[in-house]
């Protein structure tokens, strides 16, 4: 499709030349994603995970992944790993057992977040062993990641890792794990995964991880419960301990950020400052959220607006989509903690009765999908510095608790 002539591409974008558009059919791309492709020396790997396999993914997430492959072209190998023994992309075909917790090796993980934490346990080893990009399947790429990869691959640059940051506490940002790009064999990735493995131990679920001595120094969360995890009255609907349990992998990196390893002198703060290319999540991943009061219902309303809708409905939808096409890197639609969001577009699109509304012909959802492939942003991504907490670094061994500050 091409959008109606009355829709003008936004300032800050330029048309992608037809010669640069991927000519493959969706079916051809799906076959390439579903096949087992052994890693090579190339680090241009796009990694994702869906516990029950490609065929069982919600259709809108399949379209997301096909779209990644089309945007990146054949230079990148896109894989969606799964938890099905014997499948072409079973995670153990790529991640050796010693890098997985016993609960995963023995298939005894339990609780509502088995799929989420299974993905957590493969994302870091995949980047460490093979390099490339990790992205959750609930994300629509708005612009190519190639320019970020070019920075990481440039021998004149010090960067080896890229990710988003989010302000979890006043004056303190965390590096989050939805989108990450890393060079093979990066030390930070190894230490991060080792810390998460140690934290998890032989547990079968995340319950109680907030009590672990390695995380006992963390200050209470604040802004994480603003907007994304609040009700319609902006009141928190999830307790801090449950949030830390769920997102424990992220908080393991908070620990490494403040660690100087007494065994070998490795300095987490220095490593992050020198080797990580960081972008603000509220600018480059959740840019759409405050624009819609964090309401999935409002996002759904805008994207299902038809081109011939009356004003101001039509104008609002066009303005919203054009803003996304020009000003953000991707749009990640979250499920997150169970019952922790008053309205989630991911939940709406998961509902079979809304199948196809993420790309319905004649709607601004269709225009969003079209624009991400046919328009190219002209802005340059500029890295931000991680906002670390005030106070000294902790000189301890890798798995030694930080001294109490009480």
Swiss-Prot record:
Which keywords belong to this entry? Answer: Glycosyltransferase, Transferase
Gene3D superfamilies from the xrefs?
3.90.550.20
Q: State its Enzyme Commission number(s).
A: 2.4.1.-
- Give TM segment ranges: none
pH-dependence note: it reads:
Optimum pH is 5.5.
Where are the annotated segments for Disordered?
1-26
GO MF annotation list:
glycosyltransferase activity
Q: State the pathway, as annotated in the record.
A: Mycotoxin biosynthesis
The top EC class, named as a word, is transferase
The temperature profile of activity is: Optimum temperature is 35 degrees Celsius.
User: What InterPro entries would the database entry show?
Assistant: AfumC-like_glycosyl_Trfase, Nucleotide-diphossugar_trans
Regarding protein family, the annotation reads: Belongs to the afumC glycosyltransferase family.
**Any idea what job this protein has?**
O-glycosyltransferase; part of the 2 gene clusters that mediate the biosynthesis of fusicoccins, diterpene glucosides that display phytohormone-like activity and function as potent activators of plasma membrane H(+)-ATPases in plants by modifying 14-3-3 proteins and cause the plant disease constriction canker.
Identification of the protein by name: O-glycosyltransferase PaGT
Instruction: Report the source organism.
Output: Phomopsis amygdali (Fusicoccum amygdali)
């Amino acid at each position: 499709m091409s959008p109606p002539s009355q829709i003008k591409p936004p300032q800050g974008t330029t048309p992608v030349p037809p010669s640069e558009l991927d000519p493959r059919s969706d079916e051809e791309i799906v076959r390439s994603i579903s096949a087992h492709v052994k890693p090579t020396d190339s680090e241009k790997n796009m990694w994702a995970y869906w516990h029950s396999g490609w065929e069982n993914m919600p259709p809108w997430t399949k379209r997301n992944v096909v779209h990644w492959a089309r945007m990146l072209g054949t230079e990148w190998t896109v894989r969606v790993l799964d938890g099905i023994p014997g499948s072409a992309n079973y995670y153990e075909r790529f991640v050796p057992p010693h890098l997985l917790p016993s609960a995963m090796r023995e298939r005894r993980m339990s609780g509502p977040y088995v799929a989420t934490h299974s993905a957590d346990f493969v994302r870091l080893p995949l980047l460490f062993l093979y390099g490339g990009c990790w992205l959750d399947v609930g994300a629509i790429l708005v612009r190519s990641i190639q320019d970020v990869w070019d920075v990481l691959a440039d021998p004149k640059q010090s960067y080896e890792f890229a990710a988003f940051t989010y302000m979890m506490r006043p004056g303190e940002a965390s590096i989050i794990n939805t989108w990450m790009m890393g060079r093979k064999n990066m030390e930070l990735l190894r230490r991060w995964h080792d810390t998460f493995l140690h934290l998890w131990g032989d547990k079968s679920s995340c319950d109680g991880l907030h009590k672990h001595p390695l995380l006992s120094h963390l200050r209470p969360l604040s802004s994480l419960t603003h907007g994304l995890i609040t009700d319609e009255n902006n009141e928190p609907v999830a307790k801090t301990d449950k949030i830390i349990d769920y997102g424990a992998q992220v908080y393991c990196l908070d620990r490494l950020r403040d660690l100087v390893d007494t065994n070998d002198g490795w300095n987490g703060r220095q490593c992050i400052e020198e080797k990580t290319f960081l972008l603000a999540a509220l600018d480059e991943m959740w840019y759409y959220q405050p624009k819609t009061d964090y309401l999935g219902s409002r996002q759904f309303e805008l994207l299902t607006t038809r081109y011939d809708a009356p004003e101001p409905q039509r104008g609002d939808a066009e303005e919203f989509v054009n803003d996304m096409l020009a000003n953000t890197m991707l749009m990640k639609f979250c499920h997150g903690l169970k019952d922790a969001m008053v309205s989630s577009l991911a939940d709406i699109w998961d509902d079979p009765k809304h199948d196809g509304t993420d790309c319905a012909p004649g709607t601004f959802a269709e225009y969003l999908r079209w624009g991400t492939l046919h328009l190219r942003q002209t802005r340059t991504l500029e890295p931000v510095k991680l906002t670390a907490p005030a106070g000294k670094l902790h000189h301890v061994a890798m798995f030694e608790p930080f001294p109490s500050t009480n």
